[in-house]
A protein has these predicted regions:
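Helical element adjacent to the flavin cofactor pocket in flavoenzyme catalytic cores
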Residues: 143-199
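Helix-loop-beta segment of a Rossmann-like dinucleotide-binding subdomain
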Residues: 81-91, 116-118, 122, 126-165, ...
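Dinucleotide-binding Rossmann-like beta1-alpha1 core, especially the glycine-rich loop
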Residues: 50-128, 259-264, 282, 299
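C-terminal catalytic lobe of FAD-dependent flavoproteins
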Residues: 302-405, 415-416
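Central helical "cap/lid" subdomain
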Residues: 198-245, 382
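Glycine-rich FAD pyrophosphate-binding loop
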Residues: 24-45
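Active-site lid/adjacent beta-loop-alpha segment flanking the redox-cofactor pocket in flavoenzymes
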Residues: 235-351
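Conserved small/polar residues in nucleotide/adenosyl-binding loops
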Residues: 418-420
Length: 420
């Protein structure tokens, strides 16, 4: 006999957990949260995300999502460990045009409530990021409240809140294989462990969203795309930050090098480099491995060394100490991209079937809050029209167009200033 509940959330990454958390805050109970992977490192994008949170965004909606996410994560802890490290975020400028553009970002930040943002000198950058060569930059754009999230720990903290309130239950290793739909109304889901019934179902499966959409005969227009991350050998002077757990203890500021589509973050006693400066590599949801078939996790694929050569050279140029270190871990992780870079939120064409996908860690807290308000009250507090799933026209769902725009958005994810 199928289990009945008030709502089923498919996907227990940070977006699904955030929505459940905020629904519980609004008094909802009898929630079921399902995931195909093991709890709570389920194998999706949340499980390997670098955790960097840069709040500044030309979209007011996205900027507000990020600001709320920082506030939320700073309020959370799990087993005595924080879910956010407020180390600050710095975008450095290699060129004069980039440095001029930082002032545009500063204006955006101030108008959207990031009033502590400011432009800083190369020497000030050096104080917060001691491995950078200050002679290579014109300065930096600094937001003190930016920082580093511990994504899996945040999921654990929010899930604990939900279960402690007896507001919902989380079930891992439970793959959704189909949807029950009658007269265009969602009635439940079919899973590898039986059927679940509910008149509200939220899909928050990230890179698997297109596959979930096809199971329900709707389009969730995003593309999974590979993204490179590497870990360096440890730095002796950072040994005090070495930890016996996966989430990082950090002190150095989160760094972004917009002119080469790179970011850098301290990770315990070493550094991680993230690279967007490579050919976009688009996948289909159906190509992704099942959790039980993946060597480490299904959201990771083989690293491509050729794609990293230019990024490696540029990183060593900007951070000379990096040239002394070998690469100890290399991954191509998979994240979601849409045609316009905004998330897929709201009720779909099937009544009661909702989506919250293509959401980064940066915005997950705010998106979860908005989704809960939308489901409970009929509309969220924040204007989220830029993220509404119903914003798309017919051509936006054409696979060729979607892949083309997804590739372009990947190329430009760090390039608010093009052709400099």
């Amino acid at each position: 006999m199928a289990r009945k509940s008030r709502i089923i959330i498919v996907g227990s990454g940070i977006v699904g957990a955030s929505t459940a958390y905020h629904l519980a805050q609004l008094g909802w109970k009898d929630m079921v949260i399902l995931d195909q992977g093991p709890l709570f490192e389920t194998g999706g994008s949340t499980s390997h995300a670098p955790g960097g949170v840069f709040q500044t965004n030309p979209s007011r909606m996205m900027c507000k999502f990020a600001q709320y996410t920082v506030d939320l994560l700073r309020s959370l802890s799990f087993e005595g460990k924080p879910c956010f490290h407020t180390v600050g975020g710095i975008e450095v400028s290699k060129t004069k045009k980039r440095h001029q553009d930082l002032y545009r970002k500063l204006g955006i930040a101030h108008s959207y409530g990031l009033t502590d943002a400011k432009i800083i000198t190369p020497d000030e950058v050096l104080k917060m990021s001691p491995y950078i060569d200050p002679e290579k930059i014109h300065g930096g754009y600094y937001v003190p409240t930016d920082g580093l999230a511990a994504p899996v720990r945040a999921v654990q903290a929010m899930a604990k809140y939900v279960t402690d309130l007896k507001a919902g239950e989380f079930f891992g290793d439970t793959a959704v294989n189909g949807f029950k739909i009658q007269n265009n109304q969602i009635r439940g889901v079919q899973t590898s462990k039986g059927d679940y019934e509910a008149d509200i179902v939220l899909v928050s499966t990230g890179i698997w969203a297109p596959k979930m959409g096809r199971l329900a005969n709707i389009s969730l227009p995003l593309v999974p795309c590979e993204h490179q991350m590497v870990w360096l050998e440890p730095f002796e002077e950072l040994k005090e930050f070495k930890a016996d757990h996966k989430e990082a203890l950090v002190e150095h500021a989160l760094m972004r090098h917009q002119d080469y589509s790179l970011y850098f973050r301290q990770w315990n006693d070493t550094y991680v480099i993230g690279n967007y400066r490579h050919e976009p590599r688009i996948l289909e949801s159906e190509e992704l491995k099942k959790p039980e078939d993946a060597e480490e996790m299904p959201s990771l694929v083989d690293f491509r060394p050729d794609d990293f050569e230019g990024a490696h050279k540029e990183s060593n140029w900007l951070f000379p100490r990096f040239s002394e270190k070998k690469l100890t871990k290399k991954i191509n992780g998979i994240f979601s991209f849409t045609t316009d870079g905004n998330p897929l939120m709201g009720e779909t064409s099937v009544k009661g079937l909702w989506t919250a996908n293509a959401v980064w860690i940066t915005h997950a807290g705010g998106v979860g809050k908005a989704m809960a308000e939308w489901i409970v009250n009929g509309e969220p507090e924040l204007d989220v029209r830029q993220g509404d799933i119903n914003r798309f026209h017919q051509h936006h769902h054409v696979r060729k167009y979607l892949r083309s725009r997804g590739k372009q958005n990947y190329k430009e994810v760090y390039l608010s200033l093009i052709h400099i």
